[in-house]
Amino acid sequence: MNISELIHDFVLALVELGILLGSLGAVLLVNTVNSAFSLGLVFTCISLLYFVLNADFVAAAQLLVYVGAINVLTVFAVMITDEPAGSETTARGIGYIITAGTCTILFSILSFVIHNTKWSDLSLIPQSGISTSGTLGSNVQQLGYKLLGEFVIPFELLSILLLAALVGAINLARNEDAFIVNKKSAASAPYKNSTFF
């Protein structure tokens, strides 16, 4: 085993440890904000795993979609909701024990199956002496050419649709905030028999 394979295995072990610790944190942490950040760690480590395995487009898509969009949306949703102050010290009852036992059994079964499977017999990639490093790097470039060449009209229509949805969501949120402020100010103001102006 040469030094590059040793470094590759070490980086893979670090990334897999990050996935394991982040997923445990996402499940076991009681504070929902910390749980959402642990989920972000899992998504980031999965993206790094794709980078290490030379799947650069899948890694970039994972990073943009899951870390950049879904996890940020989850964190915002958790921070906007009104969480009770005493939710940090919730008691763990029988449901927690059942869930932990089920997850432990599932983890044991998956570990047994993964360990006893002959992965060399299941290879879907033809084993040849041709290096595929050149084609892996050009996949993103070819995808970009297709996306902005042959599929430019659906791509632009999708961007217009997303822009309209974003503007509509901002408009709804702004009107709702103005309604809440007006409602609070009307409730706190003393009642007078006069006009609003």
From Swiss-Prot:
Q: Membrane-crossing residues? A: 10-30, 39-59, 60-80, 94-114, 147-167
- Keyword 4Fe-4S recorded: no
Q: What class of enzyme is it?
A: translocase
Q: What is its main location?
A: plastid
Asked if the Swiss-Prot or TrEMBL record annotates the protein with the keyword Acyltransferase, the reply is no
Q: What is its EC number?
A: 7.1.1.-
Under Gene Ontology molecular function, one entry of this record is: NADH dehydrogenase (ubiquinone) activity
Quickly give the catalysed reaction.
a plastoquinone + NADH + (n+1) H(+)(in) = a plastoquinol + NAD(+) + n H(+)(out); a plastoquinone + NADPH + (n+1) H(+)(in) = a plastoquinol + NADP(+) + n H(+)(out)
Q: Which domain of life is it from?
A: Eukaryota
**What are the subcellular locations of this protein?**
Plastid, Chloroplast thylakoid membrane
UniProt entry keywords in alphabetical sequence: Chloroplast, Membrane, NAD, NADP, Plastid, Plastoquinone, Quinone, Thylakoid, Translocase, Transmembrane, Transmembrane helix, Transport
Q: How does it sit in the membrane?
A: Multi-pass membrane protein
Under the heading InterPro entries, the entry gives:
NADH_UbQ/plastoQ_OxRdtase_su6 (IPR001457), Nuo/plastoQ_OxRdtase_6_NuoJ (IPR042106)
Concerning its family, UniProt says: Belongs to the complex I subunit 6 family.
Q: What is this protein called?
A: NAD(P)H-quinone oxidoreductase subunit 6, chloroplastic
Gene source species: Adiantum capillus-veneris (Maidenhair fern)
